[in-house]
Amino acid sequence: GVRKRFLTIMSDRAYRPAQSLCMLFYMALDLCDAGTSWKAEVPKYGDAPFRKELADAVEHAGADCRAAFVERNELFLDLAENYRKEGLYRAFLTSAAEEAEQIAEDYGKIRKEDLDAFAQAFSPYEALMRCYLQSEIFSECLGEPDDVEYVTVKLQWIALEYAAIRHAAFLCWHREGALSYETMRSCMVILSR
């Protein structure tokens, strides 16, 4: 089924977790567009050459890194504000939210070199994030076997969590100059609630 194909794609270490998520969205939207014949489309996603072609298309889609960064920062600020209103996770969120607010004042101060350096600091945790995403997909994408739209909505929520976790890790890294396992764990635990 769909969840099995999602897990196959997410477990493929040939692709970064973020790239795998984009592939999953393409698959989910493709299945939604297929209408009542969507079940006939599922098997092609089990084919390794097809997945490679899909990954190449995702890689060359030309996403605007600056706009994506701004969106992640705004998402994080929204989540942080919601947690603040509830009085939750202040010890962790205060410094990360302050960093996000400072960045929001002038997005131009975040350079491509900063994002590349963060990608290097984050890379040791990609396997951890892949396991997290697999677990989320396994547990959250349980919907009705015939309800592709339900699974697509669940996948959107998982992607939002991933984006928030990764951005919180960026904020901590940017503020502290390093990304420890403990910091990464805090990002995952707090922002996946």
Feature locations, PLM:
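Hydrophobic, aromatic-lined core segments that form the binding pocket/scaffold
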Residues: 3-193
